[in-house]
């Protein structure tokens, strides 16, 4: 059947097609009763560098449908019903920055000869769009560990170049075929050049389409002006002051501009697959616009570099990352797309490559899925799996969600359950006895291990023992690392160590032995 308006319709200028359009009701089929094509499902990935401070990220207690958002999740608490928060993701004791970056979309750090999951999804959904996929970043290459700079890989396992300049992305989407930056000054606003066609289209459109078109043109105009302001501000900065790795004062503007462009590109069906790195996995950026004076990577090692000032600075950066995630979701929810919003017809993956940022623990990796995926995701849930899950299982589930024909991915042969139903095995702590036994200068404690949530003592671990105050663990970095205390947090353990007394309470100052009551020890599979 013919269409009233082709889905690939562009607003035209004297030079020809120029500006892609979002979905309009005019694009539905003419014949009454004819089935219209369903909305395309998009895939978007937002990568957060340098892991997290677990007590600020992790959800404590709660159930699948009844849970409280953690402190770091508060910026997007209003999106709770659009989120699927996954816990117990990742099954490695430790991980390097480079390996954790590779694993984020490739499932395993040894999966070096095949495409990352985003590219396999792009193969499935990207045909017929102007851009099969977009690979974007905030930070330049880190040459000392080049693998820290990439999450997207082609079919040969080679990294795909990223673009960091939102102005260039704007030109690709809205100023094609005039993509030469040197020509920008000679060009009118893209909206000025398509104004006559826009007026003509508006006259034939219904009320809802006119509202969508007005919103779209307004967003394009504001994005264009924002990019002009960024460019003007950049031209005013003396080159001698631009010393890497300082983040530019307008980084927030640049990132929000890129998120605007991502939303527009998805909304206009210019692409259906985007990856965006908020920084390299070992990001050295200094967020001076937040009042932070140290490198992000240095601050992420909050155990060995502990001070309350450093931890507060780290949490400022992590909170900023979450605010940008909130910004993206808010944008996507505001754009009408068929019978719903752009977010309703998208799957957005947010996360990092490692859990505990200091110890590089590759368990309890922060992973959130957002959007309904056209009904493919069941959101408003917190899913904590009974056992640690390989990221490859998540990727395989995503591939099947997008009808990509894969029986395995990155050493995983079964898809992760629980993404669109409650058919998964949730974490339930087995019953155990907690107790304390003391000897000559030693103590053995059995109980649940956790990190202190008091930010003034972020180096302190606690073992909860029924009927008495928790036993404190205050040890040097060597014990923290060698016994991988971060790996065991949230689970029952038995610890023997040297003990001293402080303020009338026992404090373990050196760990001699650690046994997990129910889980496996880390270290046999490091990556």
Predicted features along the sequence, with ranges:
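Short, solvent-exposed mixed-charge patches
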Residues: 525-527
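Structural detector for short beta-strands of small beta-barrel domains
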Residues: 440-457
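OB-fold and OB-like beta-barrel modules that bind single-stranded nucleic acids
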Residues: 445-449, 490-498
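OB-fold/S1-family single-stranded nucleic acid-binding modules
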Residues: 502-523
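Short nucleic-acid-contacting surface segments enriched for D/E, G, S/T with interspersed K/R
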Residues: 479-494
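Short, glycine/small-residue-enriched coil/turn segments at secondary-structure junctions
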Residues: 433-443, 490
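OB-fold (S1/OB) nucleic-acid-binding surfaces
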Residues: 456-475
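Ligand-binding pockets and gating/stacking loops
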Residues: 1-434
């Amino acid at each position: 059947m013919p269409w009233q308006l082709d889905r690939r319709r562009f607003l035209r200028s004297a030079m020809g097609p120029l500006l892609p359009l979002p979905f309009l009701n005019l694009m539905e089929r003419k014949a009454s009763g004819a089935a219209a094509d369903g909305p395309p499902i998009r895939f978007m990935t937002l990568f957060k560098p340098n892991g997290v401070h677990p007590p600020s990220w992790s959800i404590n207690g709660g159930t699948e449908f009844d849970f409280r958002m953690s402190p770091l999740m508060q910026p997007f608490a209003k999106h709770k019903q659009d989120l699927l928060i996954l816990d117990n993701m990742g099954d490695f004791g430790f991980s390097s920055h480079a390996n954790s970056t590779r694993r984020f979309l490739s499932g395993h750090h040894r999966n070096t000869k095949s495409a990352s999951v985003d590219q396999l999804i792009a193969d499935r959904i990207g045909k017929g769009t102007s851009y099969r996929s977009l690979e974007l970043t905030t930070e330049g290459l880190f040459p000392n560990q080049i693998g820290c700079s990439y999450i997207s890989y082609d079919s040969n396992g080679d990294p795909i170049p990223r673009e960091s300049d939102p102005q260039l992305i704007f030109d690709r989407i809205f100023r094609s075929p005039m993509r030469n930056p040197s020509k920008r000054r000679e060009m009118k606003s893209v909206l000025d050049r398509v104004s006559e066609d826009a007026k003509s289209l508006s006259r034939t459109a219904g009320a809802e389409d006119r509202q969508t078109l007005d919103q779209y043109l307004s967003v394009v105009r504001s994005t264009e002006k924002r990019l002009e302001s960024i460019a003007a501000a950049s031209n005013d900065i003396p080159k001698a002051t631009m010393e890497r790795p300082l983040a530019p004062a307008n980084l927030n503007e640049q990132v929000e501009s890129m998120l605007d462009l991502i939303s527009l590109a998805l909304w206009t069906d210019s692409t259906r697959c985007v990856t965006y790195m908020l920084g390299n996995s070992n990001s050295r950026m200094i967020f001076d616009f937040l009042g932070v004076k140290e490198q992000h990577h240095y601050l992420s090692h909050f155990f060995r570099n502990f001070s309350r000032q450093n931890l507060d600075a780290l949490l400022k950066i992590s909170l900023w990352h979450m605010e940008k995630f909130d910004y993206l979701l808010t944008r996507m929810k505001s754009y009408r797309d068929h019978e719903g919003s752009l977010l309703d017809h998208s799957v957005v993956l947010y996360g990092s490559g490692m859990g505990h940022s200091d110890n590089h623990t590759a368990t309890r990796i922060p992973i959130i899925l957002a959007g309904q995926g056209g009904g493919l995701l069941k959101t408003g849930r917190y899913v904590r799996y009974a056992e640690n899950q390989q990221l490859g299982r998540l990727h395989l589930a995503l591939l099947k969600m997008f009808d990509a024909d894969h029986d395995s991915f990155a050493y995983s042969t079964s898809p992760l359950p629980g993404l669109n139903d409650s058919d998964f095995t949730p974490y339930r702590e087995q019953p155990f006895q907690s107790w304390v036994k003391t000897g000559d200068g030693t103590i053995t404690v059995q109980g649940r291990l956790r990190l202190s949530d008091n930010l003034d003592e972020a180096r302190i671990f606690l073992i909860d023992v029924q009927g008495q105050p928790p036993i404190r663990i205050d040890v040097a970095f060597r014990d923290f690392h060698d016994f991988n205390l971060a790996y065991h947090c949230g689970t029952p353990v038995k610890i023997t160590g040297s003990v001293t007394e402080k303020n009338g309470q026992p404090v373990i100052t050196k760990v001699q032995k650690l046994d997990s009551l129910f889980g496996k020890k880390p270290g046999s599979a490091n990556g």
